[in-house]
Amino acid sequence: MSKNKLSKGQQRRVNANHQRRLKTSAEKADYDDNLFGEPAEGIVISRLGMHADVESADGEVHRCNIRRTIRSLVTGDRVVWRPGKAAAEGVNVKGIVEAVHERTSVLTRPDFYDGVKPIAANIDQIVIVSAILPELSLNIIDRYLVGCETLQVEPLIVLNKIDLLDDEGMDFVNEQMDIYRNIGYRVLMVSSHTQDGLKPLEEALTGRISIFAGQSGVGKSSLLNALLGLQNEILTNDVSNVSGLGQHTTTAARLYHFPHGGDVIDSPGVREFGLWHLEPEQITQGFVEFHDYLGHCKYRDCKHDADPGCAIREAVENGAIAETRFENYHRILESMAQVKTRKNFSDTDD
């Protein structure tokens, strides 16, 4: 997930792919303006290949074609669209998307072939869902937080399945979550099974477009089903009794409306995303508690590891930075280096 500009080589590949698509359809006439009504505002609730489902101001959903001049269209985009004139006469004629408004945010994921690929737009917050089962992974939480900081979208940490905790377990988990509360992150404890804690979560979702992110098996779909109501049920699979891991079942990204207000964009593509396309400096900036210490290390090229005079390591030793966060920072950097060894994401011929 990133707001970084593509490298020259990546941009060349994107442009080349775009030109090939244009060449294929060069001899096809674009849609006749006389077939469509007056322009109107709408929001893309799903992108389906060469078409998009657009919701109009009155809440109706219209299947639309997309002008060839529109190079990128994803769920959450605010658009100008026009209905097919024959639609008013009861004939099923697609509308057309004419233009896309400027995005306030773009969620992307790294792609080995096209650089970074946009998958959702205009997101206000990312709900990071974790759970005590199959495993409470602070490393996964930290990875998502780095993504949120890079995108500059507000995160909300939600710990699901608290009904499985006894008092001692709850104390331990609260101690772990205090690591995040103490550096300014919001944390909610909920149970999609008993619906404990759902009211504060509903309030946090109201008036915003959110996405739910997290590893498989933490109960994202069950939580969304509880929040959306059965009429909008998102498919889900129970966690495997053998592996303890869940399975993804939704496909294309789609925007849903919460009954209490607010929206969610859901799909496997927005639930899990990588960081390997980011630079190490971006990972460092993604740890908010590091900011006060950056620039104060003894050496300008400090790697914040075993370097002498490292201000961040000293803060860890003094208890000002949580040791688990510091360890996860280096785990993320190490995993990025391993992936980039297998696939060099950045171009070397520029």
Curated annotation (Swiss-Prot):
Molecular function (Gene Ontology), one example: rRNA binding
GO biological process terms held by the UniProt record: ribosomal small subunit biogenesis
Upper classification of the organism: Bacteria, Pseudomonadati, Pseudomonadota, Gammaproteobacteria, Enterobacterales
Keyword list, A-Z: Cytoplasm, GTP-binding, Hydrolase, Metal-binding, Nucleotide-binding, Ribosome biogenesis, RNA-binding, rRNA-binding, Zinc
CDD domains reported in the protein's UniProt record: YjeQ_EngC
Superkingdom, taxonomy of origin: Bacteria
Record-given protein name: Small ribosomal subunit biogenesis GTPase RsgA
Domain (CP-type G): residue spans on this chain: 104-273
Binding-site residues for Zn(2+), renumbered to this chain: C297, C302, H304, C310
Described purpose of this protein according to its UniProt entry: One of several proteins that assist in the late maturation steps of the functional core of the 30S ribosomal subunit. Helps release RbfA from mature subunits. May play a role in the assembly of ribosomal proteins into the subunit. Circularly permuted GTPase that catalyzes slow GTP hydrolysis, GTPase activity is stimulated by the 30S ribosomal subunit.
Binding site for GTP: N160, K161, I162, D163, G214, Q215, S216, G217, V218, G219, K220, S221, S222
Entry keyword annotation includes Electron transport: no
Residue ranges with Polar residues bias: 1-17
Coarse class of the protein's main subcellular location: cytoplasm
Record's subcellular location: Cytoplasm
Oligomeric form and interacting partners: Monomer. Associates with 30S ribosomal subunit, binds 16S rRNA.
UniProt cross-references to NCBIfam families, sorted A to Z: PRK12288.1, ribosome small subunit-dependent GTPase A
Family according to the record: Belongs to the TRAFAC class YlqF/YawG GTPase family. RsgA subfamily.
Requisite cofactors: Zn(2+)
Signal sequence, renumbered to the chain: none
GO CC term (a single one): cytoplasm
Keyword Repressor belongs to the record: no
Naturally occurring in which organism (per UniProt): Salmonella dublin (strain CT_02021853)
Entry's cofactor comment: Binds 1 zinc ion per subunit.
E.C. designation(s): 3.6.1.-
